[in-house]
Amino acid sequence: MKILQVCDKKISGVEYHRLLIPHGKINESEEVEITTAHIIDHLPDSFFHQFDLIVSSSVVSKMGFQEILWKQLKRIGIPVIIDRDDTWVLPHNHPLKKDWVSKKTAQQITYNLQQANAVMVTTEHLANMVSPLNKNVYVIPNAIDFSQDQFKPDLKVKRMKTGHIQIGWSGSVTHHHDLVLLAESFLQLKSDPDTQNKYRLILSGFIEGDAMWKEYENIFTSGYRISQEQYCRINGMDAFTYASAYDMFDIGLIPLKDTPFNRCKSELKMLEMGAKKVSVIVSDEYPYTNIAKNKKNCLAANKKEWFKQIKKLITLPELRSELSENLYNEVKENHNIEKVNELRLELYKEVINASNKV
C-alpha cells in the first residue's frame, strides 16, 4: 500500500497528531510506504499513478486551486481522504476570522469535504457536522505516540521544579474566552490561607509582543499582583517539542467554555497531559466528558468550581498522584497510537478497495 500524505513544510500541531506521527508509525510496517509532499498542484498524472491513496489535512491544494486539482485527481481515479480535527465555521470573534473570510477558507474546506472519498474526524460530534456534506465520515480519535521524545518524562526539567505546587496551562491565542473562566479562581488562590505562597502558575505557549498573550498574562497574574516567584511563562515551541512544557506541571488546567465552536474540539489536551502524568482539572463539558471520570482520572469543574478543585489538588498530594496515575493508564491503554492506527489502516484499505471496484 503506497500512501501520499500532503502537509505543509511547517508542521502544525494538527498535522503532527493527525498525519505525521500516525503515518510515521504506519511507515514502520513492511506493507505500507508513506511519501510526504508539501504541494501537489501542477504535477503530472504520472506522479499520482505510483500511489494507492492520498491523505491530506482539510484541503488537497495548499495553493488554493481546489477545483482544478480535484478535477485531475477524479480523472486519474486516485482515492482521497480528507482529515479534519475541528469545525471550519469560525465564530465572529475568532482571531483568524478576518483572514479566514478573505481567503474563503471555509468554502475551500467545505468543497474538499464534499469531494473526498472519505473524511476522517476526531469525535462523533464533528462527524455529525460533516455527515450532511459527506456520508463517508469516520471517527479516528486522537492518540499519543509514547515513543516521541516530548512524551517521555524529562528528569532534568523535573529537577528544575521549585518547592511550589506548579499549576500550568498551555495553548494558543484562540483561548481567551476559556481562560476567563479561571480569572476569579486565581484571585482566590492568592488570598486563601490554605493556598497562598504554596503554588506557582505557569503560562505555556507565550509569544513575546503579542497583545493577546499579554492579556493572558494579566489573567494569570491577577493584574500583576502576585510575586515573581508565583508565576512564570514558557515561550511557544514547535509541534515536536511543545509537550515538554508539561514536565513542569504538577496540575494541568484545561478550561473550555461551552460554545458550538468548542464542542467540535477533541480531548487531545487531556491526552497529552495524561501521557506526562499530570493531574488535570477539566471543564465539565464536551468533548472532555468523553474520557473524563470525575474523581477517578481527573477533577471536573463547572465555571464556579475552579477554585475549589484547584485548592483540593494543591492540598491533597495523594489525590494528585492517584488522578495522574489513573489518567496515564487510561491514555496508555486506550489512546495510544498503535491501537488507533489499527482503525486508521482499516479505513485506508476500505477506501482503496472501494475505489478499485468503481
List each model region and its residues:
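Conserved acidic donor-binding segment of nucleotide-sugar-dependent glycosyltransferases
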Residues: 292-304, 312-318
